């Protein structure tokens, strides 16, 4: 594979992940979509924390971009906010490692636990 092919594939992957998903609107109830958007926003609002994925540490804003892209890519599998947590935002599909949120004090929590707690706050 040439460098040009790799660059083209990289650009296509970025476009795929960044593209808005028409599937969200068709298969996901509006209330569930709003819950997912709120959960993603809550991750982005973590000012004193980092998102840990496959051993690498990321700023919350990068985690937001990543979670939206992964949700977009897996939109046909996500029928609820709980599905989003379980199928998209909890662990790496490649390595099987759980995603973590690492706070400035060194404490870590699985993203699944954080998101489930946040979901409880927004559900009636």
Where in the sequence are the language-model features?
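A generic structural signal for short, solvent-exposed coil/turn residues
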Residues: 17, 43-45, 93
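N-terminal secretory signal peptides
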Residues: 25-66
